[in-house]
Amino acid sequence: ETLNLRVKGDNGLEAVKGLDMIIHEGEVLGIAGVEGNGQTEMIEALAGLRKVEKGSFRIGETNLTNSTPKERREKGLSHIPEDRHKRAAIDEFTVEENMILGVEDDYAKGAILDFAKISAKTNEYIKKYDIRTADSKVKFGGLSGGNQQKVVVARELEKENRFIIASQPTRGVDIGAIEMIHNTILQEKTKKKAILVVSAELSEVMSLSDKIAVMYEGKIVGVLKREEATTEKLGILMAGGKIDE
């Protein structure tokens, strides 16, 4: 839940202007909108990567407004970022090494990493998520875009979480990977997770979401139930227009 969330962009101007948003357990809220209307800044603020100027963000009863990304992960936040190379993975690391980024504590015995467990879990996820790689020791940068994204999705969805942020989850991936990622997100919904999907692809937002909110100039200008939403209605809201209720 966010309440009156206000966030500045890199230019110092307000990019998110008083955002109120509630996502329930077992619900997917999709955010539609032309890119550059505050979506990136909103996601970065929720993930702890950008300062919240005003307002609040909480998961359940836990206020996470001023917490670190690590604290948010520990409280049940998973984040599939829009730029996997900048925010989610390191090309020079192996698939195994990327699979434990941010969740190293889950694979440690005291101060020592349990490499056998890391290898076993990574190979389990490679099979489960159909990650096409010779083995878990291959460098992440050597994988195709779709398989890179599957590594990030596997890591973020397999850890303990309550709230999942999926930002442009299928950008730059092939059709087969898109279907697999969509199915995985919908499976998480059945586990009573609260899920936020942000995508520039209207078809993606419409196929995954229970409700669709449209962002325009840093504000949510309309929320439609999936059965009410049409590309025409969403397009009008995305352009700053109004629709008849």
Describe the residue ranges of each PLM region.
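Glycine-rich phosphate-binding loops of nucleotide-dependent enzymes
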Residues: E1-E245
